[in-house]
């Protein structure tokens, strides 16, 4: 954003110690400051799990994803998680962890669909640093039934443009 103060009538300053108005007598030129736009990249982490999981195991890490913000610190208000497995009715007790700390509420992750985790202000990425989001759930269907031995499960995450905001710029990704 950009703003200018052109006349002394545009602002009023008060000295808090003396409780007196400060008179503006002369103008001074200033240089403009600019804030770069904000961008986000999400990649599967190199250490994201790919191994077998025991049937009915609890608190299984299904995937790890690296989030990187550039240009500005970035607030992410919602993350959408999804699972894919044939014949599976979703994952039971899904949850997201940001750098090892749970964010959002525990909820089932829909199969072939999307489940939105609302984060509010829990996820603010610092530009230029990597934040890791892990997806966990029980190795059961969303209905709590056992999975079939040998079944393959894929998980993913995504962020909608409308669910982001640059902390300083106010821009969306």
Model features per residue range: what roles?
Residues 1-173:
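Exposed, polar/acidic Ser/Thr-rich sequence context and nearby capping/turn residues
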């Amino acid at each position: 954003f950009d703003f200018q103060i052109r006349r002394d009538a545009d602002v009023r300053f008060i000295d808090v110690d003396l409780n007196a108005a400060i008179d503006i007598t002369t103008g001074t030129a200033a240089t403009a400051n600019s804030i770069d736009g904000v961008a986000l990249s999400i990649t599967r982490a190199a250490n994201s799990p790919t191994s077998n999981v025991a049937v009915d195991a609890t608190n299984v890490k299904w995937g790890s994803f690296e989030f990187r913000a550039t240009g500005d610190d970035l607030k992410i208000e919602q993350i959408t998680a999804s699972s894919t497995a044939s014949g599976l009715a979703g994952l039971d007790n899904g949850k997201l962890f940001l750098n090892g700390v749970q964010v959002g509420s525990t909820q089932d992750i829909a199969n072939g669909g999307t489940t939105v985790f609302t984060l509010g202000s829990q996820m603010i990425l610092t530009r230029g640093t990597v934040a890791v989001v892990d997806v966990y759930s029980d190795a059961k269907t969303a209905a709590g039934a056992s999975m079939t031995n040998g079944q393959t499960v894929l998980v993913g995450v995504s962020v909608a443009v409308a669910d982001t905001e640059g902390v300083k710029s106010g821009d969306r990704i």
